[in-house]
Amino acid sequence: MIVPFEHVLILAGLLFALGLVCVLVWRMNLIMLLIGIEVMLNAAMLAFVGGAARWGMADGQVFSLIIMALTSAEVSLALAMVVYLHRRKKTVDADEFRELQG
């Protein structure tokens, strides 16, 4: 069964909107902020893979693999910073990161 490209784009748009809402509503909680960013990146990957399947080219799939690699690096660094902040300040509030500048 082949899924129409329009349905893939609609799903990608809904996922992106859901991630954007997550980022905007819970922007002070760093863990929810990371989850929202991940959902938005997954929506972009879905659109790339859907476009690659639609036009029969592998460029979108290759770009999705690159996004996955960058996302894993981003998550590992951000999670390390969140763990550090939680150990030091006992909170995951984004305002606490501003005090660590220096």
Swiss-Prot record:
BP-aspect Gene Ontology terms: ATP synthesis coupled electron transport
Membrane topology: Multi-pass membrane protein
Top-level EC class as recorded in UniProt: translocase
MF term (GO), any: NADH:ubiquinone reductase (non-electrogenic) activity
Disulfide bonds: none
Catalytic activity of the protein: a quinone + NADH + 5 H(+)(in) = a quinol + NAD(+) + 4 H(+)(out)
GO cellular component: NADH dehydrogenase complex; plasma membrane
InterPro entries per record: NADH_UbQ_OxRdtase_chain4L/K, NUOK/Mnh_C1-like
Record field: transmembrane: 5-25, 30-50, 65-85
EC number from the UniProt entry: 7.1.1.-
Keyword tRNA-binding on entry: no
Function field: NDH-1 shuttles electrons from NADH, via FMN and iron-sulfur (Fe-S) centers, to quinones in the respiratory chain. The immediate electron acceptor for the enzyme in this species is believed to be ubiquinone. Couples the redox reaction to proton translocation (for every two electrons transferred, four hydrogen ions are translocated across the cytoplasmic membrane), and thus conserves the redox energy in a proton gradient.
Family: Belongs to the complex I subunit 4L family.
Assembly and oligomerization: NDH-1 is composed of 14 different subunits. Subunits NuoA, H, J, K, L, M, N constitute the membrane sector of the complex.
Protein name in the entry: NADH-quinone oxidoreductase subunit K 2
UniProt source species: Geobacter sulfurreducens (strain ATCC 51573 / DSM 12127 / PCA)
